[in-house]
């Protein structure tokens, strides 16, 4: 508990929930000290309900709980931002966000799309077709797309280049899925390199730092 110095002197503090992957703002609730402590202890978001005058675990009735991934406190120590993994829609209306905002597209969205297609029963799915064919087929397609990116770069056709890069990224994520590689592993490696200093490539074959 000592990690977080939150000012509960006024009783309640606002707590904002944000999707850990998409960074979409999901909802605003309020916590007192007891609700915050329970959130830390259970690993799922618990608010203090002003209408019910009691602790209220988000999703206690619907089952749409909010799994806590990280907690941030603002500079005045009186507002909480919680990164969560939502277990279903956040809003009682069935919307993913109480603010009805669209989910911002990200590479995580692409990864999720590939995963959803892989698990679907849609036999017409191109993703499912590639995964069924296996690594050899996927790597061949990825190589073709990478070559097309190079060609469009040489030609200087920006619009075509962007289109081919999008195709290449899609096939890269299919390949990653086939190999069981999560994008978070790539992010971790990029972060490791980013935090290194005094980079000089020299004759190295592998770029271990930027």
Swiss-Prot record:
EC class, as a word, reads hydrolase
Q: Quick one: where's region Phosphoribosyl-ATP pyrophosphohydrolase?
A: 107-210
Q: What is its EC number?
A: 3.5.4.19, 3.6.1.31
Q: Name one GO biological process term.
A: L-histidine biosynthetic process
- Annotated pathway: Amino-acid biosynthesis; L-histidine biosynthesis; L-histidine from 5-phospho-alpha-D-ribose 1-diphosphate: step 2/9; Amino-acid biosynthesis; L-histidine biosynthesis; L-histidine from 5-phospho-alpha-D-ribose 1-diphosphate: step 3/9
Where does it sit, as one GO cellular component term? cytoplasm
The primary location reported for this protein is cytoplasm
Query: What UniProt keywords are attached to this protein's entry?
Result: Amino-acid biosynthesis, ATP-binding, Cytoplasm, Histidine biosynthesis, Hydrolase, Multifunctional enzyme, Nucleotide-binding
Ranges for region Phosphoribosyl-AMP cyclohydrolase: 1-106
Cellular location(s): Cytoplasm
Q: Which HAMAP family match?
A: HisE, HisI, HisIE
Q: Does the keyword Cytoplasm apply?
A: yes
Q: Which family does it belong to?
A: In the N-terminal section; belongs to the PRA-CH family. In the C-terminal section; belongs to the PRA-PH family.
Per the UniProt entry, what species is this protein from, by scientific name?
A: Staphylococcus aureus (strain Mu50 / ATCC 700699)
Provide a Gene Ontology MF annotation, just one.
Answer: ATP binding
Q: Which reaction does it catalyse?
A: 1-(5-phospho-beta-D-ribosyl)-ATP + H2O = 1-(5-phospho-beta-D-ribosyl)-5'-AMP + diphosphate + H(+); 1-(5-phospho-beta-D-ribosyl)-5'-AMP + H2O = 1-(5-phospho-beta-D-ribosyl)-5-[(5-phospho-beta-D-ribosylamino)methylideneamino]imidazole-4-carboxamide
* Protein name, UniProt field: Histidine biosynthesis bifunctional protein HisIE
Q: Which InterPro entries match?
A: His_synth_HisIE (IPR023019), HisE (IPR008179), PRA-CH (IPR026660), PRib-ATP_PPHydrolase-like (IPR021130), PRib_AMP_CycHydrolase_dom (IPR002496), PRib_AMP_CycHydrolase_sf (IPR038019)
Native organism taxonomy? Bacteria, Bacillati, Bacillota, Bacilli, Bacillales
